Amino acid sequence: MDPTAPLLTHGGEVEEDYAPARSWTDVKRVLSTESAKLWMIAAPVGFNIICQYGVSSVTNIFVGHIGEVELSAVSISLSVIGTFSFGFLLGMGSALETLCGQAYGAGQVNMLGVYMQRSWIILFVSCFFLLPIYIFATPVLRLLGQAEEIAVPAGQFTLLTIPQLFSLAFNFPTSKFLQAQSKVVAIAWIGFVALSLHVIMLWLFIIEFGWGTNGAALAFNITNWGTAIAQIVYVIGWCNEGWTGLSWLAFKEIWAFVRLSIASAVMLCLEIWYMMSIIVLTGRLDNAVIAVDSLSICMNINGLEAMLFIGINAAISVRVSNELGLGRPRAAKYSVYVTVFQSLLIGLVFMVAIIIARDHFAIIFTSSKVLQRAVSKLAYLLGITMVLNSVQPVVSGVAVGGGWQGLVAYINLGCYYIFGLPFGYLLGYIANFGVMGLWSGMIAGTALQTLLLLIVLYKTNWNKEVEETMERMKKWGGSETTSKDILA
């Protein structure tokens, strides 16, 4: 295939791939064009994901002013049990980023709604496999070494959030469906309204009604289901091109779809559970309440930044998959370069801001001076983590857009669990550096993983990726939806 050959876009217009950038003028043109395309997707998606993460963070903030034990319990529930299920279901839903993005780029828009329905079915069934972790959360947390004073209330809170688990089965696929078509402004508005209403509900249930952590769980469930329902309503009402109604085609090739979903889930879960594991290991240290609380506060701040970069992850995944579907290898490559460069700059800004505010930002979460000092000591590690987190999600997004989930899963397994986690355990427990040692070792694992992924990107043959995308679309495309395929 000639990489500069003209191609038809969805509107029927001829659009060529980039010519090679041979001068500073060419570089500036590519930077300007790709930045605009990237942020048209990344800004709304990032804002929405920050709002979604803000639901958990605001819940921790309100609960933190009830008491330290309550904060530890809810933090453990959301960061261990909640993150486990969140990571697995988000990963399962990420298969849509590959298929919907490439199908949309290739002009097979009619298949997007079918793919989304397949993902709904798969994720809903997956929730039942995750249910025992919620039901037996207290013994699971005991098994992971959590103190009894934290494990029991954390398990009780987890039981109350079971309804939220099932909302994710519809939330994630619907979001991916909209992202693939760059219909992301509505997602941002839904996220903003949901977060605003969540704050009001927390104030009513916890402050006014005095329902404590039970009120926090109730607000958490209502907010997450409200978000999922609002997205589905938008799809049915305003996305007629990609949504043609419920279809029997959703059950076709479902096992092959499951395999791709599992590959996506393994890749993402190995990333998300890695940071979750530091919370678990910290819970086994002496003075576990202060250690867990200080680390949880840092992870909340880190998570807010990570949500922005997950938005960029989604955007670059859409950009790469769309361009590969259109047969534009150089556009895919240049979009990656621009995104990595800009993300690194943003990460450096976050690091500087955290270091400057290291003695002050913990007051948002707690009034305890002891806890504030403990958080301040971890600020430098938090800053380094933020820089690494600025690049790593971008590279993972490229992997999803290109369909390389299996390769990245192996890299994640080796860097995180064979190198990073044992190294962190060695520094934290054997060398007695505590939480700072645990975190330092795990940072080393993330740094190694980022380096290897950058090498993979550098060696990628983008023309070959286009050819593989065309083959994938032939396999998954299917036929046009007919009246026989629509469910009555």
From Swiss-Prot:
InterPro entries given in the database record: MATE_euk, MATE_fam
Residues passing through the membrane, by range: 38-58, 73-93, 121-141, 150-170, 187-207, 218-238, 262-282, 296-316, 336-356, 379-401, 408-428, 439-459
Membrane is among the record's keywords: yes
CDD domains: MATE_eukaryotic (cd13132)
One MF annotation (Gene Ontology) recorded for this entry: antiporter activity
One Gene Ontology term from the biological process aspect of the record: xenobiotic detoxification by transmembrane export across the plasma membrane
Subcellular location: Vacuole membrane
Tissue spec: Highly expressed in inflorescence tissues, especially in floral epidermal guard cells including those of the anthers, stigma, siliques and nectaries. Also detected in the meristematic zone of the root apex and in the elongation zone through to the fully expanded cells of the differentiation zone.
UniProt KW keywords: Flavonoid biosynthesis, Membrane, Transmembrane, Transmembrane helix, Transport, Vacuole
Protein name (database record): Protein DETOXIFICATION 35
Source organism of the structure: Arabidopsis thaliana
Gene name of this polypeptide: DTX35
